[in-house]
Amino acid sequence: MREIVHLQAGQCGNQIGAKFWEVISDEHGIDPTGSYHGDSDLQLERINVYYNEATGNKFVPRAILVDLEPGTMDSVRSGPFGQIFRPDNFVFGQSGAGNNWAKGHYTEGAELVDSVLDVVRKESESCDCLQGFQLTHSLGGGTGSGMGTLLISKIREEYPDRIMNTFSVMPSPKVSDTVVEPYNATLSVHQLVENTDETYCIDNEALYDICFRTLKLTTPTYGDLNHLVSATMSGVTTCLRFPGQLNADLRKLAVNMVPFPRLHFFMPGFAPLTSRGSQQYRALTVPELTQQMFDSKNMMAACDPRHGRYLTVAAIFRGRMSMKEVDEQMLNVQNKSSSYFVEWIPNNVKTAVCDIPPRGLKMSATFIGNSTAIQELFKRISEQFTAMFRRKAFLHWYTGEGMDEMEFTEAESNMNDLVSEYQQYQDATADEQGEFEEEEDEA
């Protein structure tokens, strides 16, 4: 089997990671003790991707939980599925990173990283044929962003030919924990551009807007935001966990989705959007699902896809539905809004259907888009970064941990390069040959 080793780092990473394991354990019929109580062979057919089968028919998640302070991991351990994880896979420090990327990446995190890598090796060795790693973390804090990116680069060194996939929560001024989020996020993106194969950009701003506008929650909590994240994560991993043809492993997904190695930041979406209480009231049709899924209000990244163009798209439909109808609707979207898909990648929309719907829904759709509009998210962080960096505000916290201002400048320019690369491919057309000839004539 093709296994995936899951890592979760920092407070946010551990909270959404724990939620992810709750949701997929439920979908695979696994209870909090690791015993199987399912009703379908499909649940077990590819269970090995995320779970290790231990003695006594117990299923143990291939998960490694990392943090620089014990708090969040204690609450995961005492949470609903806390006992399902392998106790040795909790790796934590005592000092905390204090929302400081440098502490996570260079000082505190660097001290803990070797003991994490030991656990990574142990998990990898129990795999038959490891396909890659996935990390859940946020980019605004200290541990998830600083130590998370340190782990990525260390794992990359040791397993250079395995896929590295991240679920990265982007900071937002609307749901802000700390004032230095733009610094931490920029330093992290600088690492993610170079060291990951696919990154799902989950944006607190978008999650907040969905809760507020669509779900009519007046004061969304992190619990509400994480409910959306876990639905999305369950959706994008469907193809990896259940039998199917399309994007059945991380590498195939990357091959379909990433036309240029640096442009691997995906915009996830989900339909139907429901709040935690109101799922069962009406079933959606395939046309409604498709329409909702492409709607900017359903995107988990605060970018408007209509401001850019799609390089590639993958859609995953779940539930009992007619393949024919799904294909018709997807073609319909591409024909109606063809200007939003780059014409120099033909057939750049791929669709998969899985029979098993998520808990509480008859059918759902998950959207993964590689859109040039994602640059809006990086621009937003970059502007906040520049505003503070110009005045060197809060910089002493980072230089005090041994960082150099030069590193900030490099991260800033790498992020700006990323934005202009997206812009370049947004403007590119299939008949560029003609434009160059015209320029020569003028010369």
Curated annotation (Swiss-Prot):
Cofactors that this protein relies on: Mg(2+)
Location comes to:
Cytoplasm, Cytoskeleton
What processing steps or modifications follow its translation? Some glutamate residues at the C-terminus are polyglycylated, resulting in polyglycine chains on the gamma-carboxyl group. Glycylation is mainly limited to tubulin incorporated into axonemes (cilia and flagella) whereas glutamylation is prevalent in neuronal cells, centrioles, axonemes, and the mitotic spindle. Both modifications can coexist on the same protein on adjacent residues, and lowering polyglycylation levels increases polyglutamylation, and reciprocally. The precise function of polyglycylation is still unclear.
Give the signal peptide as a residue range, or say none if absent: none
**What residues does Mg(2+) bind to?**
69
Q: Pfam family of this protein, just one? A: Tubulin_C
Report, as the record phrases it, the tissue specificity of this protein: Nervous system specific.
Motif MREI motif located where?
A: 1-4
Q: Which GO terms describe its cellular component?
A: cytoplasm; microtubule
InterPro entries reported for this sequence:
Beta-tubulin_BS (IPR013838), Beta_tubulin (IPR002453), Tub_FtsZ_C (IPR008280), Tubulin (IPR000217), Tubulin/FtsZ-like_C (IPR037103), Tubulin/FtsZ_2-layer-sand-dom (IPR018316), Tubulin/FtsZ_GTPase_sf (IPR036525), Tubulin_C (IPR023123)
Gene Ontology MF terms: GTP binding; GTPase activity; metal ion binding; structural constituent of cytoskeleton
Q: Which GO biological-process labels does this protein carry?
A: microtubule cytoskeleton organization; mitotic cell cycle
Question: Any idea which positions bind GTP?
Answer: 11, 69, 138, 142-144, 204, 226
Just give the chief location class.
Answer: cytoplasm
Q: Which residues carry this modification: 5-glutamyl polyglutamate?
A: 438
Q: Write the record's keywords in alphabetical order, separated by commas.
A: Cytoplasm, Cytoskeleton, GTP-binding, Isopeptide bond, Magnesium, Metal-binding, Microtubule, Nucleotide-binding
Complexes and interactors:
Dimer of alpha and beta chains. A typical microtubule is a hollow water-filled tube with an outer diameter of 25 nm and an inner diameter of 15 nM. Alpha-beta heterodimers associate head-to-tail to form protofilaments running lengthwise along the microtubule wall with the beta-tubulin subunit facing the microtubule plus end conferring a structural polarity. Microtubules usually have 13 protofilaments but different protofilament numbers can be found in some organisms and specialized cells.
* Job of this protein: Tubulin is the major constituent of microtubules, a cylinder consisting of laterally associated linear protofilaments composed of alpha- and beta-tubulin heterodimers. Microtubules grow by the addition of GTP-tubulin dimers to the microtubule end, where a stabilizing cap forms. Below the cap, tubulin dimers are in GDP-bound state, owing to GTPase activity of alpha-tubulin.
Question: What's written under domain?
Answer: The MREI motif is common among all beta-tubulin isoforms and may be critical for tubulin autoregulation.
What family is it from?
Answer: Belongs to the tubulin family.
What is this protein called in UniProt?
Answer: Tubulin beta-2 chain
Q: Which organism is it from?
A: Xenopus laevis (African clawed frog)
